[in-house]
Amino acid sequence: MPKPRTSTGEKNLISKRIIKLREKHNMSQRLLAYQLQLNGYDMDKNVITRIETNKRYVTDVELKALSEIFHVSYDYLIDGKEDEI
């Protein structure tokens, strides 16, 4: 059974917002991965790259981790409709 995708065929809903947040915070993919690792999440630069290029699905744990790092809600990451916290 195929995994679900967005209406445009993407594997995740958050790639554009992750790029936007990372750039807003002047973070490279490597620095974001490092910050995630410091917070106990096993994500490396390659994971960030694959998420940002829609080549990888995002788990609930990863969504939580990214929400914590950027201090935004899950709703913002998924829908982009809610203001950042």
Predicted regions span which residues?
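Residue-level detection of the helix-turn-helix DNA-binding "recognition helix"
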Residues: 19, 23, 37-38, 53, ...
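Residues that mark the N-terminal boundary/hinge immediately upstream of a DNA-recognition element
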Residues: 17, 28, 59-62, 73
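A short, Lys/Arg-rich alpha-helix, primarily the initiator
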Residues: 1-25
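Flexible coil/turn residues that form the inter-helical turn or adjacent wing/linker of helix-turn-helix
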Residues: 14, 25, 41, 56-59
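Short alpha-helical DNA-recognition segment
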Residues: 26-50
